[in-house]
Structure formats: C-alpha cells, structure tokens
Amino acid sequence: MKKRLLWCGFAFAVVLLILMISTESNIIQRIPFLDVTTVNDIRCYDKVSIATKSIQDFESETSVDEPTSGRNIFFHETSCFGEEGLMLNARQACAIESAARMNPSMTVYLLFVSKSEFSNSTHEIVRHLLSYPNVRIRHIDPQKYVKNTPLETWYTSGVLKKSHWPSSHMSDMLRYLSLWKYGGIYLDLDVVVTTSFENLTNFAGAEDWDDVAAGVMGFDMSKLGRRMADACVRDFKKNFRGDVWGNNGPGVITRTLQKLCATMYVI
C-alpha cells in the first residue's frame, strides 16, 4: 500500500512538472490553481506620498542631476513597502556600490517606485552609498515616466497592473524604458560588478543556451544602440503577456536580437 501511494505521489509530481514547463521558449508559466505566492501589492504605484522626508523625485523640475546621455547605470526597485519604509539589504547595496566603484565616471541611479522614507534598518546603508559622488537615489513615478514614449497609451490602459506578477513586469518595463530614454546600462540588484563597463557598449548577458538575459544589458546613444532600445520597447508593448513570467524580460531582448540578426540562435 505504501509503495502504491509513493508511486501515485511520484506520478502526480511528474504531471505537475510537465504542466509547469511551457512549450514556448522553455518559459515556466503560471498555473492559476497552483499559485500559492502572495499577490503582489502594487498600491504604491498610484499612491501620493505625504512623507516630508521621502526621497527626491527623478526627472523633477528641481532635479539638478539630469542623466547624461549613455553615461548612466540604472538599478530599479519596484516593490511596494509598508509602514516600515523603504528597504535595501546589504547584498543589494553591494551591487550598487560595486557599480559606482568600478565606473567612477558614470552616474549610478537607484530608482524606487514606492515613495516613502527609508526604514530604520536602511538609513546607514543609504548613507554609505551616498558617500559616493556618482550615486543617486530617487523616486520614479511610472505614470509620468511613460509620458511621450511608445508605452504611454499602453501603460495608461492598465494592462500591466492586471499581470500575475505586476512588480516583476514593472521592473521589465522600466529597464527597457530607462535605456530607451537615456541610454546606458541596466543591472539587476543582485549583480555585483567586478570590472569597468565604461568602454563596453551595446551588450547583454546570457540567460542560458537559448535565451539572452535582461538582468545585465546596455544600449548606448549610437544609431545601433537607439535601434536596439526602440525595438525592445516596442516588442515589450506588442508581445506583453501577464501570464508568462519571463516573456517580458529575457523574452524581449531574445526576440529582438533574433529579429535584428535574422537568426534563431543568438547565444
């Protein structure tokens, strides 16, 4: 009887595994009745902060540190934080610090979607990061950020907020949009930089043997860089799927390179 139960359990696990593996680009898809993850809290995307000590707005009229074309490194934090305030852990701070140290002539931006004060546990980390003259920590308002871009009407329609992973897909949108608007480099908050990027242009990392990664990539202000950035933003808009986690991140840069290079094999 025990063996039968074990075999039944094993068979059930295999069936679940098969169901979870998509036949499209080997991307794991969402199975609604099996989704036990916490629903993304995205209320901060539309919330107006009344905090007097909240971080400065990016692209505000009072901003004196307008991004320099192509000389920027962007990190985005798209989580919404509660009453405890904005949080940044030591690993994330290490990623930002490494980018600033290895690229002293580039401006490193950490952009939060949630606007609030920093949590007590984060104050010391932030103070240390801001000791670097090329580090900027700002708040970004998605509704304003998409204005006068190919994504303005699309974002206003509310499609992204209906995603199964709105926070992750917001991050996908912002990384391509930041490079479209200003040029430069985007890095995930778990990427530690060990060398200079200052002479590296128009690049992306490898996700695996089939897909290009969206966690490390750069588009400069050259004709090629502008073409890549524009193609990625338009692919994101055209092929966005809220039910496929990786379709809007690595999927975008992979499809774009396949199209521009006229090949299925870009790795």
Model-derived features with residue positions:
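Glycosyltransferase-associated regions of secretory-pathway enzymes
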Residues: 1-171, 189-267
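Residues at helix C-cap/C′ positions in short coil/turn segments immediately following an alpha-helix
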Residues: 104, 182-183
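Small-residue hinge/turn detector
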Residues: 172-182
